[in-house]
Amino acid sequence: MMSRCLYCYQELGEGETDFHPQCGKKIFGSKTVPLLPYTKADIKQLAEQVIRSQTTLTGVQAKLSLDISSSPNQPQRFTIVGLWGRYILKPQTEQFKYMPEVEDLTMHLAELAKVNVVPHSLIRFADGELAYITKRIDRTAKGEKLPMEDMCQLSERLTEYKYKGSYEKIAKIIMQYSSVPKLDVINFWEQV
């Protein structure tokens, strides 16, 4: 059975595991992919700690914020960092099987349809289970927050109501705040 790259889905060469070096560089900034040293059991326990510390990321799906850490003479590895990581990790869920694979495939299909998407990939836990990882576009290479507005902020809605809006409302907000409103609203309608 042939192995495929978790980033681009193309066949891997001899000696390559999970990623082509150039694909690792695209998503992780290094040809050597950082280790994801956790297992499913670790993630469940760590996620509970993150929830207790109230440093969770908003949204419907369970997710964790990661960053890459390195020590002298040690390979780079992902660590869970609360809100300020440069990556978001979405593990498998009991409720919806294969959710990471579905999300990654959906993003690949969107790219093929010429929709701009964030850098994303599948990645393996230490126990071999797949998770979805995406690079945050609201962080600098050093992890500093970049100012970005989202539709909740522009509409002055709390994030817990972000899934209780309409496309029409979003289009009106785009028309109100965009510097090129007609172009942006056309792009919005093409994406939805």
Model-derived features with residue positions:
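Conserved kinase catalytic-core segment
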Residues: 95-111, 165-192
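Short secondary-structure junctions and interdomain/linker hinges
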Residues: 12, 158-161, 177, 181
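Short, hydrophobic/aliphatic alpha-helical segments
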Residues: 40-48, 186-191
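A short, terminal or domain-edge coil/loop segment
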Residues: 31-36, 41, 65-67, 170-185
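Regulatory N- and C-terminal appendages and interdomain linkers associated
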Residues: 1-44, 176
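Conserved ATP-binding subdomain of kinase catalytic cores across diverse folds
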Residues: 42-162
